[in-house]
A protein has these predicted regions:
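Positively charged n-region of N-terminal signal peptides that target proteins for export
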Residues: 1-4
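Active-site-adjacent structural elements in enzyme catalytic domains
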Residues: 22-24, 33, 38, 43, ...
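A post-motif C-terminal structural segment
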Residues: 24-25, 34-40, 44-82, 132-452
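Small-residue-rich
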Residues: 80-86, 90
Length: 452
């Protein structure tokens, strides 16, 4: 099936190059914190574990993409999101405005709406987070969550889906302070004609003609890919439903963000990070299915806003060896394991290091017996000593994360962003325009030029 997908993508590229027309359906995917290292880590993991190649890495057109903001070589998501959405640079922290906040930029989504296209915004994070907000918001600070929520409501876009709206009644003045009681964003949305949904079953039952949608799949963000159960909504499902609801004769613009890639980049957590990239790839597959039905009318672009974590494939401790398949042994995110560990301590008064060893083996595949030179997941004497010390100091999750990175051969240089260029790939109508070396502002400006 994977080979058929890739074959179809390449055939589309050949057919369209002969006489392309402007696309009616424009689908932009953004991996927050996703640069080439994250793409390739996920690719190698997928190959080693039998999943196959990532479709995002095998689109026919590629462009190395510069991400610098006006205030720093190292951008944040607000400035990068604004550049990708609006085609103009700004300073870190700004959303859809100049560095001084005096001039508003028009995003490709807003222009599409003005030209009577339907518009959708999807993310794994809160819908008023920096990247998605860059397509409809205009604020001096990305932290103005409530005000960005108001911008969301006033955008009149057709489809919003993700982790809900952060601080729907206002952000507390300081940590621990009570939240303000401003008019609830969800109530404002309903008054503006949005159908506000929080139930997955009701959401999945939506059909074309349902009207404007604001769907909150979970409070804060949808479940991490590594932790998600069958009952949890996925980015692929949010994307597929968006494609279904937005389709019309005029066309649509849909932006889909894999926002949680960034979260696990900041945390330097390889296993969870790569699974978010795979989740984004699954969402892109839904777009490719759609393109198969509308091959000459669809453009799919996949990019990142910046790199997060300074991730490297290979580090001093592993030399020239890498073992990406070892990350398959990790069954939960580090934060989820922390919660499980806390619950286990509460449930058993005499909870001991022997108890935690069983949990470590169950959720990470690490073995406390055996020779690490012969058994890949066996712990060395130093690693066992580090884990026991971490258990005594209540720092076990962080030490487990470090050991799993070491086992795979993954290194990290920072808990913040880096200035690495990102990779942009594209397929479909006019995809050839995303080639060579470009700036992130070029993405919006190219897409704007394709709107009729």
């Amino acid at each position: 099936m994977k080979k058929l997908f890739l074959f179809f993508v390449l055939v589309c590229a050949v057919v369209l190059s002969a006489g392309e027309k402007l696309p009616r359906y424009i689908i932009l995917f953004i991996g927050d914190g996703m640069s080439t290292p994250q793409r390739m880590m996920a690719e190698e993991f997928a190959r080693k574990t039998g999943r196959g190649e990532l479709i995002i890495n095998h689109f026919p057109f590629h462009a190395s993409t510069r991400t610098v903001s006006t205030s720093s070589l190292v951008t944040d998501s607000a400035a990068a999101g604004t550049a990708i959405a609006c085609g103009t640079k700004t300073a870190n922290g700004r959303i859809g405005v100049t560095p001084d906040g005096k001039i508003r930029f028009e995003s490709v989504a807003e222009l599409a709406k003005k030209k009577n296209y339907k518009v959708g915004i999807v993310t794994t994070m809160t819908i008023n987070h920096a990247t998605p907000a860059s397509f409809y918001g205009h604020r001096i600070s990305r932290s103005q969550y409530y005000e960005l929520g108001v911008d969301l409501v006033n955008s009149d876009f057709d489809y919003f889906a993700g982790g809900g709206v952060a601080f729907p009644t206002g952000k507390p003045a300081k940590k621990g302070a009570p939240a303000p009681k401003l008019p609830n964003i969800y109530d404002l949305a309903a008054k503006k004609g949005y159908k506000v949904l929080k139930d997955k079953k009701a959401f999945m039952a939506l059909k074309p003609g349902s009207g404007k949608i604001l769907y909150s799949g979970a409070p804060g963000r949808i479940s991490a890919a590594i932790d998600a159960g069958k009952e949890d909504i996925t980015l692929a499902e949010l994307t597929a439903k968006g494609l279904e609801l937005l389709k019309n004769e005029k066309g649509f613009f849909l932006m889909v963000e894999g926002g949680t890639i960034d979260s696990y980049g900041h945390g330097n957590e390889a296993a969870s990070n790569l699974r978010e990239v795979l989740a984004l790839d699954d969402a892109v597959k839904e777009a490719v299915k759609f393109m198969k039905k509308h091959p000459q009318d669809t453009l799919i672009v996949v990019t990142g806003d910046h790199e997060t974590g300074g991730m490297t494939m290979g580090f001093a401790g592993s030399g020239y060896a890498m073992y990406m398949d070892r990350l398959a042994h990790q069954k939960v995110s580090i934060s989820k394991f922390g919660s499980l560990l806390k619950d286990a301590r509460k449930a058993k008064k005499d909870f001991s290091y022997a108890d935690v060893q069983k949990m470590v083996t169950r959720y990470f595949g690490l073995q406390f017996t055996g020779d690490p030179k012969k058994e890949p997941m066996a712990l060395s004497a130093e690693q066992k000593k580090a884990l026991e010390a971490a258990f005594q100091k209540n720092r076990l999750p962080g030490t487990l994360k470090l050991i799993m990175n070491q086992k795979a051969g993954i290194g990290w240089t920072t808990g913040a962003h880096t200035a690495l260029p990102v990779l942009t790939t594209a397929t479909g109508a006019q995809a050839k325009r995303f080639s060579g070396f470009i700036d992130n502002t070029d993405i919006a400006n190219i897409l704007k030029s394709l709107l009729k």
